[in-house]
Amino acid sequence: EIIDQIKEMAEKNSDNSVYCLIIGTIYSNQESDLYNVDSALVYYDRAIAINPTDENAYINVGSMYIDKSAALINKANELPLDKYKEYDALIAEAKVFDEKALPYVEKAYELVPDDNAIRQALRTLYARLKMMDKAKALE
């Protein structure tokens, strides 16, 4: 399998974060049979440890958490009005993922402050987490 070949390359080139980033990306692809968030996080963390100034791993981890949060928010919004307890539970769970995403997106923004997509993602996270002063500062 290609993933095994890339893992082998990552082991042979342990100072090159690109292989870990590629493996993380493969595991984080929801369309893939290899989709596995935990494995993706392991490889993204390795990529960050090897190259802490490469924004891509930070962006990808943040995006994984943001996607999980968004899915929960969408699920909550589809509930009937009388399911407010389930709604509150889903929103609370989404907040946990937003909180997990925040340091990764903040670091990505620190590394590439001119990237409008990262800026918007960070602004959205700040708004969801009710950090309005920080959200407004990014306008």
List PLM regions with ranges.
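Canonical positions in the second alpha-helix
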Residues: 9, 46-47, 108
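Short coil/linker segments at helix-helix boundaries
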Residues: 29, 33-38, 67-104
